[in-house]
């Protein structure tokens, strides 16, 4: 079958062949590979085609493969996926999620998080490094950042606020409801 033929080809040619295929067909092939090999091939592709293939993988196949990818290559593919990239981020193991978000320029990470619902964003940012979370939140609208902080656990939300300047934190907290704001501010040193 196609998978066996691709595996028999020189490894450096395979990513080029996959990106010329219909992404659905390429995803069907990639899903049947050993996760490490699939990850290797995807990260050798430009972000757009790699992201297109990731869109057509089922959640369990995506999880098996992306958790073995290089954080920078994965981050670029996730960014190229647009709104579909949010679900990939949500499914990453915690350490890889932190590595992906911190390896991308903060504006790129922010643009990915901006596409997420506030619940999805809170779920993702609770697991990110506090400094990364702070940087991302400061690049969102203060209203969206406030919504996300209210949905995060108090400890992680407080850690993110502690990594912001006083003026940045105040510009976000002013849009929060009183009770969640008080809970989070109690966590600050």
Which residues fall in each region the model found?
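Hydrophobic packing positions in regular secondary-structure scaffolds
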Residues: 1-189
């Amino acid at each position: 079958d196609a998978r066996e033929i691709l595996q028999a080809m020189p490894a450096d040619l395979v990513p080029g062949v996959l990106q010329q295929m219909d992404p659905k067909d390429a995803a069907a092939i990639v899903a049947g590979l050993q996760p490490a090999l699939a990850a290797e091939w995807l990260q050798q592709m430009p972000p757009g085609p790699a992201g297109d293939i990731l869109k057509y993988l089922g959640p369990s196949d995506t999880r098996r493969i992306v958790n073995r990818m290089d954080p920078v290559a994965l981050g670029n593919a996730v960014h190229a996926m647009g709104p579909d990239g949010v679900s990939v981020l949500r499914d990453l193991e915690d350490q890889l999620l932190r590595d992906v978000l911190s390896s991308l320029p903060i504006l790129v990470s922010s643009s990915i998080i901006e596409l997420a619902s506030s619940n999805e964003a809170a779920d993702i940012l609770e697991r990110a490094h506090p400094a990364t979370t702070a940087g991302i939140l400061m690049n969102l609208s203060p209203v969206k950042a406030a919504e996300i902080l209210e949905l995060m656990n108090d400890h992680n939300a407080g850690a993110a606020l502690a990594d912001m300047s006083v003026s940045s934190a105040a510009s976000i907290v002013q849009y929060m409801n009183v009770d969640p704001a008080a809970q989070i501010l109690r966590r600050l040193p």
